[in-house]
Amino acid sequence: MQKGPCGTELGRLSSKQNMDSAQPTKLDFLTVPATPFSIGVLASIVVLVTVVIGPKAVIDTVLNSYLSLVHRIPAADGKKYMSGPAYTFPNGQMVDKFLAARTRSWEWEEKYGKTYRIWAASIPEVVITDPKDVEVLYQQSTDHNKAPQANAGWLLTQLLGSGLGLINGTRWSTLRKTLDPMFSHRAALQYLRDSLDAGAQDYVAGIHQFAKADGQVQTADGKVMVINATQALQRYPFFEVASMFYGKMSEAEHERLWDLGRRYSEVFAAIVSGGIHRSKLTRYLNTKAWNNARDYQKAWRDFNREIYTARKMTAPDTPIVALTEAAERGELTPNEVTDTIAESTFANLDIVTHVISSCIILLADSPEVQNDLLQEMEKNKADRENYITRKDTLLHYCLLESLRLRPVLCLKEYWLTQVKAFTFPENPPREKILGNFVVPKDTTIIVDAFAINIRNPFWGPDNRAYRPSRFAGIKQSQLRYNLATFGYGPRKCLGQHIADKIVKAVVYHLFSKYRVSLMPMQAVEGDFKVDKTSWVALYDVDLKLEPRES
């Protein structure tokens, strides 16, 4: 039996699909004349099979056989080929990789081994689950390219095609060089002192506005409030990240940006569903998703142009001014500016919300750890800002443990450089030996973060238990390939220096002000409830907040 983050027994996964890829077999055929009779019989058989098992099953079988033959990946000893779930038309495993990653991660490794192949539409992606293979992958990785269109199709390029996470080569290095000073360690520390810490404190002070209407619970000590973790927390990281580009924003600008985020999410949902939206056909057929994308693009360009004009007059040092003027000088393109801001805010809204809510929910479910954290925070409250930046504290370990157990990792390069449980696809320009298979150059490779963060023997027999203190005895160098958080290689997360501070600042102020616990009935099948309408499966968990004594 497997265990949840707090040691809860979970049932073993039982839903198994017959997803084996066809293994190529060499056959010697007799020479048969192609007579009208034999062709007619063959055609009749094809029609009969199609009627009996259905046209989609026939298409899936034929295409899987063809793709498995064309994209064979041999073992180093030449005795077998890499296996994996069968291709299914039209998306392959793309939807499962987004929406059922946690379940599929376990199923696929159990069925196909530690190195296997899945399909992003008709594109093969090699999945690695062993830290040793991760190390091999990222040796000599300075020239790795991100997969074209992230293997997600054409419509994605209309949202983020020129953003930092999707471009390669000189375009990437030029844009990254422009952005790095804005998100350096020094800049992150200054941001914490100037606004982040105060912003987190103000947000927690006003969190009562998100209290559920029926969530006031009378206790002997007075009233406590009940909040939904996701709904109460998601605006905080969204506007903190936005302010790094736009500076201090008005309430009207906040609401306009929030609406743009909603419109972005509608289009992204169509991207996740795949199908026709993977190609330009979605444009030629004038689909609703394409119309929504076009309307969003115009509104997004207008918003950034107006913000630039306003900040140029009132706050010329704001990053949006510097980035826009770099585009005007021809150093960047306008789309590189707007798409990078979009991936840093909209593409990461659900991701960052999940990271923060995971950290808080796991603490709420562990009163002992919460009490230890409170004692540590009390000892360090006189030097709060320095405490939040440190990486040798229980506060930091709580963040790492939540990232380990709940690796929802993002689509883009700004925050956490991974998609759900699987890293952002990239194509090494050289052959790699991974899991004893010879992976050809330019083949897409992804890392399974659930395998690295949880099933990895490095984490010991309690690898599914929530125990933040485990990090106290682990050297940073040991985590390099045993913990998937901010990505690997030269394209490691641009926002790594500020990401942890955003999370830890709000955790510090929330738990300093409130005793946080779970309301009853917040688990389903041994894990916390989730909102299945979100592609990230955000938590649908209610928290009880009881004010601490001053």
Swiss-Prot record:
Q: Which cofactor does it need?
A: heme
Matching entries from InterPro entries are given as:
Cyt_P450 (IPR001128), Cyt_P450_CS (IPR017972), Cyt_P450_E_grp-I (IPR002401), Cyt_P450_sf (IPR036396), Cytochrome_P450_monoxygenase (IPR050121)
Q: Name one GO cellular component term.
A: membrane
Tell me how this protein sits in the membrane. Answer: Single-pass membrane protein
| Highest taxon listed in the record's lineage | Eukaryota
The UniProt induction remark is: The expression of the hexadehydro-astechrome cluster is induced by glucose.
What are the TM regions of this chain, as residue ranges?
39-59
**Compartments where found:** Membrane
The keyword Oxidoreductase belongs to this UniProt entry's keyword annotation: yes
Describe the inactivation phenotype: Abolishes hexadehydro-astechrome production and instead accumulates large quantities of a single shunt metabolite, the prenylated Trp-Ala diketopiperazine, terezine D.
Q: What does this protein do?
A: Cytochrome P450 monooxygenase; part of the gene cluster that mediates the biosynthesis of hexadehydro-astechrome (HAS), a tryptophan-derived iron(III)-complex that acts as a virulence factor in infected mice. Within the pathway, hasH, with the O-methyltransferase hasC and the FAD-linked oxidoreductase hasG, convert the hasE-prenylated Trp-Ala dipeptide into an O-methylated diketopiperazine that is then released from the hasD NRPS. The HAS biosynthesis begins with the synthesis of a tethered Trp-Ala dipeptide by the NRPS hasD.
Q: What is this protein called?
A: Cytochrome P450 monooxygenase hasH
